[in-house]
Amino acid sequence: MPTVPAALTRPALVWAGGTQEQGADMDQPIWLTFLVAFVFMNVLLIGMAYMTWYERKVLAAMQDRVGPNRTGPKGLLQPIADGIKLLGKEDLIPANADKVVFYFAPLVVFVVAITRVAVIPFGNITIEIFGRTINLWITDLNVGALFLLAFGSLGVYGIILGGYASANRYSLLGGLRSAAQVVSYEIILGLSLVGIFLISSSLSIRTIMEEQTRDLVFGLGPLTLTLPNWFILSQPLAFVIFFLAAVAETNRAPFDLPEAETELVSGFHTEYSAFRFSFYFLGEYINMIIVSLFAAVLFLGGTDGPGAERFWGIGILWLLVKVIIFLFFYIWLRGTLPRFRYDQLMGIAWKVLLPLVLVNIMVTALIRLAGSGELPLPF
């Protein structure tokens, strides 16, 4: 009888006081934590800027075009030029708009998006610079995965408020669409991760990433097969469901119903321009990067890869490669698939993905019980 991988047979989650992992960042001075947060958030903003360049280049290659190539070498300064142009635009406010809410709504989307980076580990070790021990994460919450999921759903408030405050029917309809879409797909997104929580016995993102650094060894007669313990191998269905739900949650094509240009002009941000529009724009692309980091850490081993144990920089490089690959699939979907109808969007969530993710949870739980000997088997 084939053996069950050890990763599926560990003890269940224990919630009794203090048995979960405690934050390893508590020994770091608070000023150093703020400095790390400042660096991480600025790196995220720079990454977001060049995500737009990357997307335009990939789409251009798919459509047999050149893409941005005028501003700087290979168009690498195009994001800077776009930002300057955007900030120079006139900031228009509809006459009948609720001005306070209109001002406030885009900021909600941006702040919620960038706050999510706080629980993403860029490595599972500490490094020493100028005699100071520095963590490669801002904070290590023992429920970091729940934090990411919760804040991912909070951004929809900024979209709904922006659509409502614009005094525009297209904007309001876009906001309502976004609310229904997030409610539907946030459930799918969370349930797709339950299998990982069962396997790793933790909700801490650092613990889940560390769990994947242990190789799985399978004996096949005289041969031995060694595979990385990445959860994409033990949870392939969950990974596919997570990816589809993540694309829908971030309002990206082919799930971009809240801003469908052919139906709603520009949806919830139809009336926004200049600086305030940039907050919506920043929020969307930052969410894409955060979700890609989330997927890389939970399913693809995070910083795990050849040579990562020798130098922390190699681990970060592996994490970056995985994020870029995940972002490529975002762009690939946009360049190849048409937008779904709204009834198709909801049907996929409730009639297809929800039953599949529940089956995945049940199968994972049964395998885990069988491996631990707690499930009576007829053989």
Where are these regions (language model features)?
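Selective transmembrane helix interface/packing segments
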Residues: 23-379
